[in-house]
């Protein structure tokens, strides 16, 4: 619906979006996004018969929304597993057999599993446990419930050749993940980010899915370019799509000034002026309505988009009176 809007049908210069879920909040911005999917065909080699095959599982990370939770310092299972393997490979002969991490493209990955073959199991386990201990100490206050499991398994099939293994682990460790830039306009707002959501290594193919977000279109292009460059540098095929625009905050818009003043007069306290690092319809609508000033507000809604969704009836009356007062004060020619 929003994507197919014909902007020529509307003449107004102010857009009131009635979709914010806290009645004391005025939303003035959101993030757009773009998906980056990569693929690389690697050379396979036989698993050394005398080497031991280990299965490493990482579980129990908090995960979360890769926009709203990206600034909370939570662990990314794909990045942790890549680090574990990279550090092991610096001192121990390793063959990488498989890797499966993450789930949804817009979620911070909570779990990852890989299988490797090692020449010296005792030395490899010692190095793995050392890196695991370092990670645990680094994230002790943020990720207290995560755990690694290492077990010996029987494995058939082939492993990745050594040069491709080095290339892929280097790329996974180097590619940006997390906050890319904070907003200079809105306190504590993430302006741009990237999340390495999915990594699969299986039977000759290495694929990844990541999502870049930004409320500023030029910055979204910058961060998506950085991710693209990292994977193209290793020879991977990169496809980017699903692009949707962000809504850049304008702290000096006339409608914001008006609604802030009205809120103070009506409710004897200032509203919370915020922007979010996730997608809202205003980002898409704004693309079709250049020059339009936008703001979003609404009654208290909880558990939105779930079977438990509910609205606080008392806040609907507050919201309604605020809406009517706002409409009264908007000039006829706006």
Task: Please state what every model-predicted region is.
Residues 74-77, 105-182:
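A conserved active-site cap/scaffold subdomain adjacent to cofactor or substrate pockets
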């Amino acid at each position: 619906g929003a994507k197919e809007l014909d902007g020529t049908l509307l003449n107004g210069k102010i857009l009131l979006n009635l979709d914010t879920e806290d009645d004391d909040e005025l939303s003035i911005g959101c993030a757009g996004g773009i998906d980056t999917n990569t693929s690389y065909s690697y050379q396979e080699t036989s698993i050394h018969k005398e080497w031991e095959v280990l299965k490493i599982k990482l579980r129990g990370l908090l995960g979360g929304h890769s926009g709203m939770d990206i600034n909370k310092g939570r662990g990314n299972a794909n990045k942790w597993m890549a680090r574990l393997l990279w550090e092991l490979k610096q001192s121990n002969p390793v063959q990488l057999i498989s890797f499966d991490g993450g789930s949804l493209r817009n979620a911070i990955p909570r779990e990852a599993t890989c299988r490797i073959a090692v020449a010296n199991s005792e030395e490899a386990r010692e190095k793995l446990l050392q890196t695991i201990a370092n990670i645990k100490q680094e994230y002790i206050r943020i990720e207290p419930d995560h755990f690694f499991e290492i077990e010996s398994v029987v494995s058939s099939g082939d492993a990745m050749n050594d040069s491709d293994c080095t290339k892929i682990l280097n790329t996974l460790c180097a590619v940006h993940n997390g906050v890319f830039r904070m907003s200079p306009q809105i306190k504590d707002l993430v302006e741009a980010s990237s999340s390495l959501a999915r990594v699969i290594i299986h039977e000759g193919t290495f694929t990844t899915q990541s999502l870049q977000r930004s409320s500023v279109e030029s910055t979204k292009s910058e961060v998506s370019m950085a991710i693209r460059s990292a994977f193209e540098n290793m020879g991977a095929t990169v496809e980017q799509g699903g692009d949707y625009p962000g809504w850049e905050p304008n702290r000096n818009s006339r409608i914001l000034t008006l609604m802030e003043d009205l809120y103070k007069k009506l409710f004897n306290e200032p509203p919370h002026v915020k922007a979010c690092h996730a997608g809202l319809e205003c980002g898409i609508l704004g693309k079709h309505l250049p020059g339009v000033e936008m703001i979003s507000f609404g009654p208290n809604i909880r558990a939105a988009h779930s079977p438990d969704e509910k609205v606080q009836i008392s806040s609907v009356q507050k919201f309604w009176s605020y809406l009517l007062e706002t409409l009264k004060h908007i000039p006829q020619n706006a």
